[in-house]
Amino acid sequence: ALHILRVPAHKAARCGVAKLSVDARHGKPVLVYTMAITLKDEGEESAYAGASPCVCFTQPTRFSFSVGDTALKTRPVVVGLGPAGLFAALLLARSGFRPLVLERGPELDERVKAVEHFEKTGELNLNANIQFGEGGAGTFSDGKLTTRVGDPLCAFVTDAFLQHGAPADIAWRQKPHVGTDLLRGIIRSIRQEIIALGGEVRFNTALTGLKIENGALA
């Protein structure tokens, strides 16, 4: 990529694979690599505009959200430690909100034992099974990641997975795949980060109802 653009290596801050896909439209399948280059001096980008017809300039999309200016009286509560709850709690924890997470099922190791027991005996634990417990239903999948191209949340989730031990190629493969064993370790690691940042996770704790007074949570 640097050679095609005639970019000296010392001017590149980063150069790597951004995406790998397969083009099978014309008979024999062809691997198509999309490369991403970040220059140390962004002001020099325009100088390489005509180096190749395949070159385009883009600004990476990153997930961001606005933070209010009123202090919270209580910690935010996240219900469930499935994929949505896990990343909601992670984002809140990284933003300094010390979330309280309520999960009706057990932590991952106990949950795995309960599922193995069910597979052997047929005895179902209503709170520790393939649906409920740390990691949610995805914990017992094979770790395939469904992407939403162009959604900045993709980068946030992918970066979190990479920071917690996922293979580097999930950042650029067309159909990224983590694998069950690695996925479970990643989930534990994310939970540990949430706790380290002041969050709290309460397992075997089900939300059974909400108390409403004057049209608001009491």
Residue ranges and their predicted role:
Residues 28, 110, 116-201, 205-206:
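Conserved N-terminal/central alpha/beta ligand/cofactor-binding core
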Residues 16-21, 203-216:
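A conserved short coil-to-beta-strand element within the FAD-binding core of flavoproteins
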Residues 2-74:
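Extreme N-terminal leader/targeting segments of oxidoreductases
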Residues 26-31, 182-186, 211-217:
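A short, glycine/Asx- and small/polar-enriched loop/turn
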Residues 3, 90, 94, 192:
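Short, well-ordered alpha-helices that flank and scaffold nucleotide-derived cofactor binding pockets
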Residues 40, 94, 164:
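Residue-level recognition of phosphate/Mg2+-coordinating polar/acidic sites
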Residues 72-75, 171-173, 204, 217:
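Phosphate-coordination loops involved in phosphoryl transfer and adenosine-cofactor binding
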Residues 71-106:
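N-terminal Rossmann-like FAD-binding beta1-loop-alpha1 element of flavoenzymes
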